[in-house]
Regions:
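RNA-binding accessory domains that recognize and position tRNA/RNA substrates
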Residues: 1-199, 203, 207-208, 222, ...
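Beta-strand-turn-beta hairpins that frame and shape the catalytic cleft
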Residues: 166-171, 279-282, 320-325
Length: 356
C-alpha cells in the first residue's frame, strides 16, 4: 500500500506503508543512530514526534527484549528500508508486526537522506503520514502549521510510584519520561530507586528522606511544565544531592531563572561529542533533545557551564554553585549509544556519600 509523508513546507515523499494505516500529524525529527532502533522506539522522549532513522536499513535483528519502556512512543516511524527477514537468536518478532500491534503508522522506501537534509537546512517541521491518495494539500498544510505537541510529560510519566530494591543509597527518581536504563544504572550500583510520577510534590519526595534525587529525561518543551518547575524550586532549596539529565536538566535551569529555546533540528543520535570544561576531556554521548539551555541567561552566582557540545557549542551540562547539584543534557545511561559518561552515576553516588 502506498503511503505519503507531507511536510509543512509542501514537500511530499511517496513510499510504502508500514505498521498501522491510520493518519497522523506530528513533529518530524531525525535520529542518526546506526543501531539501537528498538531503544529509540521505546524512548518516552519521542512522544509527540515521528522519527526518521537516517541509517538506511532498519530492523535487521528484529524485536528483542532491549526496550526502554513497556511500549513504543513515537507517533510515526520513517525509514529508507525495513528488513522483512530479521535474524537474531533473541528475535521475538519484526518491526512491522511491532508497529502494527501498537497502532503506529510509518512509511518506508523514501529518500531519508533527502528528508534529513531538508530538516537540517529548514529546521524541524511538522508533517503528516497518510495512505490517502486523494489528499488535499490546501486542506492539510494549515493543519500542519497549527500542530503543537503540547505538554506530553503527563502522557509518559508513571501513574504511581514504584520501587527497585537495593541495599545502598536511596534515590528518588522523578519520572518525566524516564528510560528504564536510568533506574537500572542506579540499581546496578546498589541504590534503592523509588520512581515517582512527574507531578509528585517536593514535600512528598523530601518527606521520604532520600539520599539523592534524580531528574529524568522526557519529551516536549520544558516551559510547558510550569507546575513541575515550581516543585523543583523547593527541591533546589533543600540540601539533598540532585543529578538531572535531559528534560530534568532544562527544568532545573528554568527553576533557577535561566531560559531555554528550541533548536533548529536538535541532537538525536549516539555520536555527539561533548567536552568537560573542567578537564578538557571529550566524551562521545547519546543524545535526544530539541531544546537547550541559554547559558547567557544563567546567573553565574547560581550555576556555571560544565559541558559543551563540540559540534555547535551549545550547553551540555551545568554545575550549581554552592550546591550538590549537577545536570547534563546528554544521556549517561546511553541505550542506545556509547557509555563513555556512565561514570556520572558513580559521581552522583559519591556525592550522596557513597554506597558501603
Amino acid at each position: 500500500m502506498k503511503a505519503f509523508l507531507i511536510l509543512e513546507d509542501g514537500t511530499v515523499f511517496t513510499g510504502t506503508s508500514i505498521g498501522s494505516t491510520r493518519e497522523i500529524i506530528s513533529e518530524i525529527v531525525f535520529n542518526t543512530s546506526m543501531t539501537g532502533y528498538l531503544e529509540v522506539l521505546t524512548d518516552p522522549s519521542y512522544a509527540g514526534q515521528a522519527v526518521v532513522m537516517t541509517y538506511p536499513l532498519i530492523g535487521n535483528y528484529g524485536i528483542t527484549p532491549d526496550m526502554e519502556s513497556a511500549r513504543p512512543w513515537p507517533d510515526g516511524y520513517i525509514v529508507r528500508e525495513l528488513s522483512r527477514m530479521p535474524s537474531n537468536f533473541r528475535c521475538q518478532g519484526s518491526i512491522q508486526d511491532f508497529l502494527t500491534k501498537h497502532d503506529i503508522p510509518g512509511i518506508a522506501g523514501i529518500d531519508t537522506r533527502a528528508l534529513t537534509k531538508i530538516l537540517r537546512e529548514k529546521g524541524t517541521m511538522n508533517g503528516m503520514i497518510t495512505t490517502n491518495e486523494n489528499y488535499n494539500l490546501d486542506e492539510i498544510l494549515p493543519k500542519l502549521k497549527e500542530y503543537t505537541t503540547g505538554n506530553v510529560v503527563d502522557k509518559v510519566t508513571c501513574s504511581e510510584k514504584n520501587v527497585l530494591k537495593g541495599s545502598g543509597k536511596k534515590v528518588a527518581l522523578m519520572d518525566f519520561g524516564a528510560k528504564n536504563n536510568i533506574a537500572k544504572s542506579l540499581n546496578a550500583r546498589g541504590c534503592e530507586v523509588t520512581v515517582y510520577p512527574a507531578h509528585t510534590s517536593a514535600e512528598e519526595i523530601l518527606g521520604a528522606n532520600p539520599d539523592g534525587i534524580m531528574l529524568s529525561n522526557g519529551p516536549g518543551d520544558p516551559k510547558e511544565c510550569t507546575a513541575i518547575i515550581e516543585e523543583l524550586k523547593k527541591l533546589y532549596a533543600s540540601d539533598v544531592p540532585i543529578f538531572a539529565i535531559w528534560l530534568g536538566h532544562q527544568l532545573m535551569a528554568l527553576a533557577n531563572g535561566a531560559d531555554t529555546h528550541k533548536m533548529k533540528y536538535g541532537h538525536r543520535g549516539g555520536n555527539h561529542p561533548v567536552k568537560d570544561l573542567s578537564t578538557g576531556r571529550v566524551y562521545i554521548s547519546s543524545q535526544n533533545h530539541g531544546y537547550v539551555v541559554d547559558t547567557d541567561t544563567l546567573d553565574p552566582k547560581v550555576a556555571k557551564p560544565a559541558f559543551v557540545n563540540v559540534n555547535d557549542g551549545t550547553n551540555e551540562g551545568l554545575e550549581y554553585v554552592g550546591k550538590n547539584i549537577f545536570t547534563v543534557q546528554f544521556h549517561p545511561e546511553a541505550c542506545p549509544g556509547p557509555q563513555d559518561s556512565s561514570y556520572l552515576f558513580d559521581r552522583f553516588i559519591q556525592m550522596m556519600g557513597g554506597n558501603q
